[in-house]
Amino acid sequence: MGDLPGSTGGGSGPAAAGNASGNSSSAGNTGLGVAGTTGVDRPPSPARLSHTSEKHPKVTLTELNMLRRHRELCDVVLNVGGRKIFAHRVILSACSSYFCAMFTGELEESRQTEVTIRDIDENAMELLIDFCYTAHIIVEESNVQTLLPAACLLQLVEIQDICCEFLKRQLDPTNCLGIRAFADTHSCRELLRIADKFTQHNFQEVMESEEFLLLPVGQLVDIICSDELNVRSEEQVFNAVMSWLKYNVAERRQHLAQVLQHVRLPLLSPKFLVGTVGSDLLVRSDEACRDLVDEAKNYLLLPQERPLMQGPRTRPRKPTRRGEVLFAVGGWCSGDAIASVERFDPQTNDWKMVAPMSKRRCGVGVAVLNDLLYAVGGHDGQSYLNSIERYDPQTNQWSCDVAPTTSCRTSVGVAVLDGFLYAVGGQDGVQCLNHVERYDPKENKWSKVAPMTTRRLGVAVAVLGGFLYAIGGSDGQCPLNTVERYDPRQNKWVAVSPMSTRRKHLGCAVFNNYIYAVGGRDDCMELSSAERYNPLTNTWSPIVAMTSRRSGVGLAVVNGQLYAVGGFDGSAYLKTIEVYDPETNQWRLCGCMNYRRLGGGVGVMRAPQTENYMWCENSLKQHNNPPS
């Protein structure tokens, strides 16, 4: 900062006298002055220093909060539930339009020193009043469902926005419908829009959730009538509708025609329309449904008439989405465990190497949680592992900061249910395990849940309808065909119908509301056979066998198609993959991985928004050429 301007003072003789008498504004302007002239006369400029305190608002709020805590100068008490909350009207009115209207208008509460607030959670109110005094709040899973309604009532828009942002970040296929309903109830339009988009984008996973089966008919119609619904074919929409219907046939069959009119039956294949839709007993027993089927048949049989038959049911859906990609992780190749990881893109039918794990892992359990790929346990060729690595496809990096499981586990089953990562069975080098534990990513902590009724290594796991299924495996003596499922609400395992074939080291996945179990090994040999489980009838039924025998096979659904990856055929490790077509009940080969893999894990994720795979270009050279 420069010096303050000053003047040079007076002289002597006539000039000085003239200044004294003729320019009174400069009289006495000697030493430090605030205005003056030097040579050329200028209008005086008063000195100023403007200051705005950045600390003042925080300090003032802190002091006001201290007064509140000590109940000093408080002029209102809020009775909420069984709790009394002391406060200052002016602070509440400044922060909340609700309180401003209450205390500055003609309402009776404006004259009361104690005000009762109804229909609001007392803990949520305490947090919101704290926010008014501190500008700080923590929104978390345990309080968001009470905070958001309270913030809406008090018209605290900033807190509403924070709660909605928190819920957006929590969206996944198992909870998006509940969050959507919550947003609709509280008129959170942006959250409702995001939840709708998420539901449409992830419909193939959403339709397998328990929330979907519990939908009211109106919400189901809202979802399936969307042009943006992301499905591989209209068959998936029909299957989803029938699963919903059969969840409670007695109450829902009256709505079948109302719902079926939003399934675009003319877009079905003729075989599916006649063989599946037209032959369904519930459809055949409803006249309006039969009319819809006849309309679709006419559309398919009379192509020359189609221009005259256009309507909402003949309009193809227009989903916009990033495709899914499949990751093959670790495994056993040429006599040793491997750390390599590669990615398959069905749109290009290409396999690319990505960053390897830090440890070699065979018998590794793999699952995707919150858009991150977890590799759990396994065997590195010398030791049984309890360590875990986590892969981020956006950065193409593995991290090792995940808490280890409580037990070493190889040949372990891993799956995600209700936001938790479950590790099921396996072996620890001493015994076959029935232990089950689950990982909370928020706490970075594993905790044990109820053990299975049977010890299982080489077990396959799947999640369907809010249950965790443990399928087959070996008890340490012989392969199993038994199946049990875990209910997290009761923390209990219950047996369900067994498979028709004993299988250990099998692959399994949920596809079109069935659990598919393929390959594995029985008492004598590696298997190519496959079967699927219907949870509505609690029955297993066979499907066509794969083209190759595959033990230690990975099975996954990618972009609505079922892929079997790698394995061992009894004489050679495999790098081939094959895909299943449920309409034709056939498997076909569709390419090869870079590495042969037995006992590798597979996981499916959205394709990264950016191709951050600089490592890939030289990965094969750095790790030598993969075995042929």
Swiss-Prot record:
Kelch repeats: 325-371, 373-419, 420-466, 468-513, 515-560, 561-607
Keyword list, A-Z: Actin-binding, Kelch repeat, Repeat, Ubl conjugation pathway
Functional pathway: Protein modification; protein ubiquitination
Gene Ontology process terms (BP): negative regulation of synaptic assembly at neuromuscular junction; proteasome-mediated ubiquitin-dependent protein catabolic process; protein ubiquitination
Disordered: annotated segments: 1-56
Domain BACK: 176-278
CDD domains: BACK_KLHL20, BTB_POZ_KLHL20_KLEIP
InterPro entries for this protein: BACK, BTB-kelch_protein, BTB/POZ_dom, Gal_Oxase/kelch_b-propeller, Kelch-typ_b-propeller, Kelch_1, SKP1/BTB/POZ_sf
Low complexity composition-biased segments: 14-29
All residue ranges annotated as the BTB domain in the record: 74-141
PANTHER family given in the database record: KELCH PROTEIN, KELCH-LIKE PROTEIN 20
Record's protein name: Kelch-like protein diablo
